[in-house]
C-alpha cells in the first residue's frame, strides 16, 4: 500500500486542557504509514475543523486518492437532503445529495466512502488514544489552555509525532498528487452558496440579510458566496469580488430549519462565521447570535 492511497478522517471530543471542558480535535492519518497529515481543534466537531485539516494536508502533502471518514453529516448528507436533488443536478448526472465538504473533495477528485464502524478506522482510533495521553501532558508543560494556542502548537507537534511514530509504507512510492496551481485554497475550502440578488442588491443566508455595496449589479444577478474563517465572506459575480454589509442578522433560534440549505452543523458554522466577521463591532440594533 502506498502513502496517500487512503486517509482515515475523524474527530474526537476530549478534555484536552484538563479543565473539565471538552473540545474537538479533527484529524487525518495516512493509512499506509500512520503519518498525521493534519490536526485542528475547534469547540465542536464541525465543517470548519475538517476544512482546516484538509488545507494542511493539501499544502503539506498534496491530494490523496481517497478519504475514509464515518457517516457524520459533514461528509454525507442525511436522507432528507438526498431526496431533494435539483433538475440541474440530475441533468449533470447526480443521483444523490452532497454536502459542502463532499462538494470540495469531489472537485479535487478525492474518492470518499464511509466507515461502517469505529473498528474499521482502527489507525485513527489508536491515534486518538495516543494523543489523549500525550497531548494533555504537552499542553500542560507548555502552558497551553486555549484552542488558538493549541492549533499553533499542533503545527510543529505533527512533525515531531510523525518523525517518532510513522512507519514506511509497503510500497515506497507516494501517490499524493500535487495540487494544481489553478486552485485557490481560500476559495475552495469554503462554505459555498449561490443566491440571486433582488432590486436593492440584497440576498439572504438562513434568513440573515446582506446587501452588496456596489449598486452596479442589475437585479436578479446570480452571485456566489464564500464563507470561511480564512476570508470571512467573499461575494463574486462575473469573476469580480464585491463588498457586502449586513442588514439583518438572525439568531440560531430563528433559522428556517425547513430550508434545503439547513443542517444543524451548517447553521452553526454560518452563525459562527457571521458572528466572527460581522458582530464583533456590530450596532446594538443587530440581533445577537446565540
Regions found by a protein language model. Name each.
Residues 8, 67-69, 113-114:
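A structural signal for short, well-ordered beta-strand segments and their strand-loop junctions
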Residues 58-93:
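Acidic/histidine-rich, metal-coordinating catalytic segments
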Residues 1-9, 14-15, 83-96, 174-181, ...:
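Basic, flexible linker segments flanking DNA-binding modules
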Residues 94, 100-170, 175-187:
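Charged alpha-helix within mobile-element recombinases
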Residues 158-289:
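C-terminal, beta-rich DNA-binding module of retroviral/retroelements integrases
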Residues 52-72, 231-235, 260-270:
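Short, solvent-exposed cationic patches
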Residues 38-44, 87-91:
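The substrate-binding groove and active-site-proximal loops of carbohydrate-active enzymes
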Residues 1-36, 43-65, 102-107, 201:
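Mobile-element integrase/transposase regions
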